[in-house]
Amino acid sequence: SLSGPAARALAANGSEKAGQALVAALKRRSGSPKTQKDVIRAIADAQVKEAETVLLALQGAADPNMQKEVLYALSCVGGSNSLPVLAKAAENAGYTMEITGANEAYIALLKRLVQSDRDAVMKAAKKLQKAAAKAGQEQTREAALQILLAAEEPAKVSKMVIAAMKDPSK
């Protein structure tokens, strides 16, 4: 299939027109699932922000491999509209690694949005930290703490570090 090389060529081009072509291809939803996955991956690689709405519509795919591509792409191009969708996907995944990569995608999105949407990220990371603790997922809890430390004002970081050091699960 030539869909993979063609989609990667458009992604490598990096122009606005190339991004528009990828989004248009995804909107048409033509071709095989492999073709769609190739286009979704290219959108992620080219960081085509305009694709968020189309990707959100594709989220929830029955095919776990398609879902993985969509969630990965949302982690690369999504904005605050993607936060609740990826939060729910991470929750459904039990805040751990599994085939769709939902938890990893959510963490990656939070890390990417720290600078542009600090308040929403802080709120989401605090919620993630509590939920991960409840689920017994220490690695996700640690990732949420790293996000909080990156987002927090420097004056408050030392307090957070001291509190983390006193945590019984250290």
Give the positions of each predicted feature.
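Residues within HEAT/ARM-like alpha-solenoid scaffolds
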Residues: 34, 65, 97-101, 120, ...
